[in-house]
Amino acid sequence: MTALNSTCSLQPRTAFVQRRTAETDVQVRLSLDGKGQHEIDTGIPFLDHMLAQLSTHGLIDLQIKAVGDLHIDDHHTNEDVGIALGQALAQALQDRRGIYRFGHFWAPLDEALVQVVLDFSGRPHLSYGLELTVERIGRYETQLVREFYQAVANHAQMTLHIRQAAGLNAHHIVEASFKAFARALRMAVERDPRRQDGIPSSKGVL
């Protein structure tokens, strides 16, 4: 590895995104090469808990602050946090040079078992297979889980497959999915020492 490549590889991979609309004001700051430290306040307690799993198990330092129209419902804030997080991931990865690109992980949580497979392909896609038989976890509407993942996949420009192999408790299923997502994400964004600063695509661009 040349000195230039070595220097490029060690550049900090950080991002700051602010998304401000008539409905929400969301700020996301992250470091992909962190220790899992986090400060998260979206105003939605269950989403905060899930994002803490993402930070802890993905070793992503993550600060998120969101103020939204929660007096209406959680939909706008949930989606806009996903959008801003996806944009922050894309910003931190830039042209995706030197990463493994693909990631996969199976995560159990008691009776629940969920697999996540992802690809920073530049082609947004979500294949979502969680089977949640209740409408809410606490106050959090379970249909918002899919909306969150769709927003992240779209704006991080990743292909994201989420599959449930087992599970009865909705909280366990969703939390297992976030833990699996965290570990798959960690695998995909790790620097590949053999690839150095090359683009992980035969096309030469992602």
Curated annotation (Swiss-Prot):
Keyword Amino-acid biosynthesis belongs to the record: yes
Group of enzyme by EC: lyase
Keywords, sorted A to Z: Amino-acid biosynthesis, Cytoplasm, Histidine biosynthesis, Lyase
Gene3D superfamilies: Imidazole glycerol phosphate dehydratase, domain 1
Enzyme Commission code: 4.2.1.19
Sequence intervals crossing the membrane: none
GO process annotations (BP): L-histidine biosynthetic process
A Pfam short name: IGPD
GO annotation, cellular component aspect: cytoplasm
Species this chain originates from: Synechococcus sp. (strain JA-3-3Ab)
Pathway: Amino-acid biosynthesis; L-histidine biosynthesis; L-histidine from 5-phospho-alpha-D-ribose 1-diphosphate: step 6/9
HAMAP family (UniProt xref): HisB
InterPro entries hit by this protein: IGPD_sf, ImidazoleglycerolP_deHydtase, ImidazoleglycerP_deHydtase_CS, Ribosomal_Su5_D2-typ_SF
PANTHER family: IMIDAZOLEGLYCEROL-PHOSPHATE DEHYDRATASE, IMIDAZOLEGLYCEROL-PHOSPHATE DEHYDRATASE HIS7
Annotated GO MF terms: imidazoleglycerol-phosphate dehydratase activity
Family membership noted in the UniProt record: Belongs to the imidazoleglycerol-phosphate dehydratase family.
Taxonomic lineage: Bacteria, Bacillati, Cyanobacteriota, Cyanophyceae, Synechococcales
UniProt name for this protein: Imidazoleglycerol-phosphate dehydratase
Entry keyword annotation includes Glycosyltransferase: no
Intracellular or extracellular location(s): Cytoplasm
Substrates-to-products reaction catalysed: D-erythro-1-(imidazol-4-yl)glycerol 3-phosphate = 3-(imidazol-4-yl)-2-oxopropyl phosphate + H2O
CDD domains noted in UniProt: IGPD (cd07914)
Main location: cytoplasm
